[in-house]
Swiss-Prot record:
This is Oxidoreductase claN. Signal peptide: none annotated. Its EC number is 1.-.-.-. Pathway: Pigment biosynthesis. Pfam families: adh_short (PF00106). Induction: Expression is positively regulated by the transcriptional regulator wor1. Expression is down-regulated during biotrophic growth within tomato leaves. The expression is induced at later stages of infection when conidiophores emerge from the plant and produce conidia. SUPFAM superfamilies: NAD(P)-binding Rossmann-fold domains. It comes from Passalora fulva (Tomato leaf mold). The lineage of its organism: Eukaryota, Fungi, Dikarya, Ascomycota, Pezizomycotina. NADP(+) binds at K38, D57, N82, Y148, K152, T183.
Length: 218
């Protein structure tokens, strides 16, 4: 049976891979990207295989209406919240108020908005599935990634509660916790600045190694 998938942040990395896998399995795919024109140039195979690009910015409240409109036009069975390609690295005490909100915006508020936009249509077109892409950092809490781990923990907590809310409607909520993979994740966030008090400590070594790994993958 063919379902309609909507995948957020599908222009590169894991999101693009999921979109292509769904297309190859015979499903319909709506690939979300902040700049569809650029995305279609970077990943033309998604459109060539029948995928539809959608301008989708989950950092704005309007994303709810954008998803609702797309669902009305194409249908919607599966939502993939491909959040997490951005991680602020550094010592917790050094993060600014803006950075605190920025990390939560990317990995928590954005996916929640997408879910809110999709739910009315998912309920109407059973069965439905919501995939929230999380991380093993929620389990291990890697040194130097405190904000990232917190944002993923928030998404997983909401997912567990939502599982109970939606079970009666035939909608599954699944959390995916991928480990290390060959994407540009390590280079997506800004280079960490380590406070003087932490220079030479374990957290300093881990952060600098993360930067080195990112450089090796480019």
């Amino acid at each position: 049976m063919s379902y309609t998938w909507l995948i957020t942040r599908a222009s590169s990395g894991r999101g693009a891979a999921i979109a292509l896998a769904a297309l190859e399995a015979g499903h319909k795919v709506i690939a979300g990207a902040r700049n569809p024109a650029k995305a279609s140039q970077v990943r033309p195979e998604i459109q060539n295989q029948g995928g539809t690009w959608l301008r989708l910015d989950d950092s704005t409240a309007d994303v709810r209406h954008v998803i609702a409109k797309a669902a009305k036009e194409h249908g919607l069975n599966v939502l993939v919240n491909n959040a997490g390609g951005y991680a602020l690295r550094g010592v917790l005490e050094d993060f600014s108020e803006t950075e605190l909100y920025q990390q939560m915006e990317t990995n928590f508020f954005g996916p929640i908005r997408a879910i809110q936009g999709a739910l009315p249509w998912s309920r109407a077109q059973k069965p439905g599935t919501i995939f929230n892409i999380s991380s093993t950092s929620d389990i291990t809490g890697f040194t130097g990634f405190s904000l990232y781990a917190a944002s993923k923990a928030a998404l997983e907590g909401a997912s567990e509660a939502l599982y109970g809310e939606l079970a009666l409607f035939g909608i599954r909520v699944l959390v995916v916790q991928p480990g290390a993979s060959r994407t540009k994740f390590q280079s997506a966030g800004p280079r960490p600045a380590v406070s003087e008090a932490c220079v030479g400590t374990t957290v300093d070594a881990i952060l600098q190694r993360a930067v080195g790994m990112a450089a090796e993958r480019r």
